Amino acid sequence: VVLLSHLGIRYDEQIAETYPQVNLIIGSHTHHLFEEGKLINETYLAAADRYGYYIGCIDLTVEDGQLRECQIVAIPTKTYLLDLDKEDQVFIQAMREEGYRRLAQEKVADLGRKLSFEETCQVVLEAVCQETDSQLTVLNTGLIMKTLGPQVTMADLQEALPHQMRMARLVVTGQELKEICQEVFTKAELLRNQTIKGMGFRGKTFGQVITGNFAYKNGNLLYNGRVVDSHEKFSLVLVDQYYYAAYFPTIKEKDATLLFPDLLRELVAKYLRKNGANWDKG
């Protein structure tokens, strides 16, 4: 049994430990490298990094329907030593400039002034709640790469929110929300200055945790100026990264509805088209 996996190394290793009937797992998530493969119990794992830096070679010896031998090697290609073709450079730059030009022509809103970073964060918080019809949200400031205004185009939103992220909505009780916040705020202190890669994130560091339409202070949840009842139910929307990543197991345990088709920046664009300079008047 050969498994081509896009799940990532953590799940590949878990499968190898749990399902001995899987003979070989070929890691196609391209975030890790096994130069000579890896053997967990009776399962072989192969992975050849990313960007064509390695070519993976797997030789299997099968007799009478049984795997007798498996040889794995990742061969370095040293593509980083190659010069980029001049014509390729010109083509890539032309495509990048054309893409930016088209996005810059797509006007979204006139905010009347340049927003501060805190105001830009507030716009994003309000946008994801309103455009996903959710009561609450939790985000991190590392998602916001630049401030907005006075004029906002899709090029601005591409620069401010470059992430390939959609939203995930959960329905939680007040008690479950408190447990999520306890975990998120505690781990956020460790993640704050950590460089984050993968899962659609195109920023630099995680940043601070910010909340929309509620507050979490001293272990208490405040919603509409009152302490939240533990049995009260809320719709909570998050970027899908929180659901997929290993940072917050409390979130991963919940049933989540992944919201399609809009990316984070597209939700903000919809919100600003409706509200414009009146975004803070609601």
Predicted segments, located by residue:
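Feature captures C-terminal
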Residues: 143-282
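Active-site metal-binding loops of divalent metal-dependent hydrolases
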Residues: 5-8, 28-31, 49-50, 141-143, ...
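Structural recognition of the beta-strand scaffold that forms the well-ordered cores
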Residues: 1-4, 24-27, 46, 136-139, ...
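A short C-terminal boundary segment appended to hydrolase-like catalytic domains
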Residues: 62-152, 158-160, 270-282
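Divalent metal-coordination and catalytic microenvironments
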Residues: 2, 25, 60, 128, ...
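Conserved acidic residues
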Residues: 23, 133-135, 234
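Active-site-adjacent helix-turn-beta-strand microarchitecture at beta-sheet edges
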Residues: 12-102, 188
